[in-house]
Amino acid sequence: VDEASVVNELQKMEEEHIICGYHTLIDWDKAGIEKVTAMIEVRVTPQRGMGFDKVAERIYNYPEVNAVYLISGGFDLMVTLEGKTLREVSSFVTNKLSTLDQVLSTKTNFILKKYKDHGTVMVDNSKKDEREMMA
């Protein structure tokens, strides 16, 4: 397949929103930049005739929010976001998310360590954990 055909096919898939975007995956630890990643479970009251779509739209329009998913289980939505500090994430939950009329409750989970993200292994396996070496 020649390069022009690949470029044309990619452009067509972008126009048809088959390819929705491109993302850069950054290891913030290696970059020396502190980031706090949170996964927030949200229980909401769905709107008549709109279901969860309207409240999900309100949430995903906040610039801090990276992703919003409709989920099964005890909560309805999963919201992921990154902040500079725990306080910044807490402020978002307290002042923006929990104040929405449809939001009944939230449960915030902080990411302590990323092992794999978007299909990419984020740990350096060449450095064995000391506990493994002792075994």
Segments from the language model and where they lie:
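A compositional/biophysical signature of low hydrophobicity enriched in polar/charged and small residues
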Residues: 1-135
